[in-house]
Swiss-Prot record:
Protein name: Golgi to ER traffic protein 1
Residue spans, topological domain Lumenal: 1, 127-177
Residues passing through the membrane, by range: 2-21, 106-126, 178-194
BP GO terms, sorted: establishment of protein localization to endoplasmic reticulum membrane; mitophagy; retrograde vesicle-mediated transport, Golgi to endoplasmic reticulum; tail-anchored membrane protein insertion into ER membrane
Record's subcellular location: Endoplasmic reticulum membrane; Golgi apparatus membrane
Main function: Required for the post-translational delivery of tail-anchored (TA) proteins to the endoplasmic reticulum. Together with GET2, acts as a membrane receptor for soluble GET3, which recognizes and selectively binds the transmembrane domain of TA proteins in the cytosol. The GET complex cooperates with the HDEL receptor ERD2 to mediate the ATP-dependent retrieval of resident ER proteins that contain a C-terminal H-D-E-L retention signal from the Golgi to the ER.
Source organism per UniProt: Candida glabrata (strain ATCC 2001 / BCRC 20586 / JCM 3761 / NBRC 0622 / NRRL Y-65 / CBS 138)
Topological region Cytoplasmic: 22-105, 195-223
Chief location bin: endoplasmic reticulum
Family assignment from sequence similarity: Belongs to the WRB/GET1 family.
Keywords from the UniProt entry: Coiled coil, Endoplasmic reticulum, ER-Golgi transport, Golgi apparatus, Membrane, Transmembrane, Transmembrane helix, Transport
One Gene Ontology cellular component: GET complex
Bilayer topology term: Multi-pass membrane protein
Protein's UniProt keywords contain Oxidoreductase: no
Lineage summary: Eukaryota, Fungi, Dikarya, Ascomycota, Saccharomycotina
Length: 223
């Protein structure tokens, strides 16, 4: 395996691991960034205080300790407002951090992988024994990538303008084989098909909600 293929495989594996672990991202972010933030600490403190006051209200009688019960209710109303405001701030803070992490992923993974594919997209992963092993159109796409199909209409238009005959030339390519771009496309297609079959075999079927029967009238007709 060449270093070009090895780097491409590393990019694919890292991106797939991030995709498969999406459900755990919130837990990781919470433990790393959100749990010890000042807003989160204050939010948890207020929630515990509200829970304590609610338990205290349940343990006392509203008739025997009306003043205490009323004072606690006022505290609860104030705490509810503060908790709502802090919850909105915490949500905005979380979304801001997630946005920064998406930018980091874009700069460290997505953009470098795209640049790498543009740079080494025509790198031959598998060599073909000879030029005529497959149809010229297929061989051209495999060795030059999907851009080869986009260039064909331009070559056809050029041949019409110049009056020369149009032919798909593949013998002039320095190397004939499967390029890195096509190989990555095939690899991702195989992975997607495996994911689809796995989901079909092991995913739990979604049951339809049962219909509720309601009695809309109590009339009884007698023939």
């Amino acid at each position: 395996m060449s270093w070009v293929v090895a780097i491409a495989v590393v990019f694919v594996v890292v991106l797939k691991v991030l995709e498969y672990s999406t459900s755990y991202h919130d837990l990781v972010l919470q433990s790393l960034f959100f749990k010890n933030s000042p807003i989160s600490v204050k939010f948890e403190t207020l929630v515990k205080e509200r829970r304590s006051i609610q338990e205290e209200n349940k343990s006392i009688s509203a008739q025997d300790n009306y003043a205490k019960w009323t004072k606690n209710n006022r505290k609860l109303d104030k705490l509810d407002k503060e908790i709502t405001e802090l919850g909105a701030q915490l949500k905005a803070h979380n979304e801001q951090i997630k946005g920064h992490l998406k930018k980091v992923k874009l700069l460290l993974l997505t953009v470098p992988f795209l640049c790498f594919k543009l740079w080494k997209g025509k790198h031959i992963v598998y060599n073909l024994p000879h030029h005529q092993m497959f149809p010229q159109l297929v061989a051209g796409v495999w060795s030059q990538g999907w851009l080869y199909l986009a260039i064909l209409p331009l070559q056809l238009a050029k041949s019409i303008v110049t009056g020369s005959s149009f032919a798909i030339e593949t013998a002039s390519f320095p190397h004939m084989g499967v390029s890195l771009g096509i190989w990555l496309w095939a690899l991702n297609s195989v992975i997607s098909n495996i994911e689809f079959m796995t989901m079909q075999l092991w995913a739990k079927p979604v049951s339809k909600p049962s219909k509720k029967l309601e009695i809309v009238t109590d009339e009884i007709k007698v023939d």
